[in-house]
């Protein structure tokens, strides 16, 4: 629930400065999973996770519940090819719950022109990530079209 704090007025120290915010009633949660104390990726995109977030929004009586699910990172256990399956599950959850249709505003996928990733040193392939592995363009296009059909 720490992520929901941005909707409220805050006061904190930042690099020696006393900072006060007005809060942001339009703030949203980004669900990218997490890592436990053993280094294991722990996803948070499942139906139960989304419903728990919805309940936290309701308990705090927040006006604009909003979440975006990151289909990669810890939600995919850093296995980028799992992104289409994760997006499909999120869409399935939205179809079966009016609350989740209100809550989940979108998904994030990591994609680039070429699939995978490459080291920054040496010869590089144009359009291939030098950071996280990504879906290639064809898989991304297919995923977007499938999402449009299911939405």
Language-model segment annotations:
Residues 1-8:
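Short, small-residue-biased leader/transition segments that mark boundaries at the very start
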Residues 9-20, 46-62, 90-96:
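Structured alpha-helical segments in the cores of large, soluble enzyme domains
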Residues 18, 23-40:
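Positively charged, amphipathic and often flexible ligand-engagement surfaces
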Residues 26-30, 66-68, 104-108:
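Structural preference for beta-strand elements that scaffold enzyme active sites
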Residues 32-36, 72-76, 107-114:
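Active-site beta-loop-alpha junctions enriched in small/polar residues
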Residues 69, 136:
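Conserved, mostly hydrophobic/aromatic
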Residues 75-87, 117-122:
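Short glycine/threonine-rich loop-to-helix capping motif typified by GTGT followed
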Residues 90-116:
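Substrate-binding cleft of secreted/luminal carbohydrate-active enzymes
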